[in-house]
């Protein structure tokens, strides 16, 4: 029986793409650049590729923040090089943008009556702490684990070992829910816990991962927990 849930935040409980759009629109506007849908798509692709490198241990968090902006600005000949300032402003904008998915806050309230719930996220400390506070998620869960603070990121087993030591969760009674196969599901596999892939777009499993459950709507989780 599942009595502990490890939740991913961005792309699972909160709409990250909507937040990303808000963040880039806000920050580009401040330097006199208008964001188009094509530019947003290119930035999303660049950002995703950098985070995938990070998950594989091929780059640091700091290299992500500078590298993705260098690549994106270079793509559109944007003559702006204060990457550190732009990134700091961007992290704050991301934290200000809260777009719950599938009425997720109500779901957290309901599940909190019978389960322990912890947030496990690779997002930046600034953005995560802001959005968790603004959304109220920090008050609806039993703890928050941000990889930047922990010093290790998903999907590394050591990240989950840290969470287990801090919470005392029992592997056989714990489920991770997330949208990323390479971070959340692979991390759950490494940790030896059950996995639930949030897959609203009906994608296919790829890579060396094992998925125990797949859901298209977060509320389907209630059926899984009732088994």
Where are these regions (language model features)?
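Short, conserved clusters of charged catalytic residues that mark active-site
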Residues: 102-103, 158
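Glycine-centered short loops/turns at secondary-structure junctions
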Residues: 114-115, 192
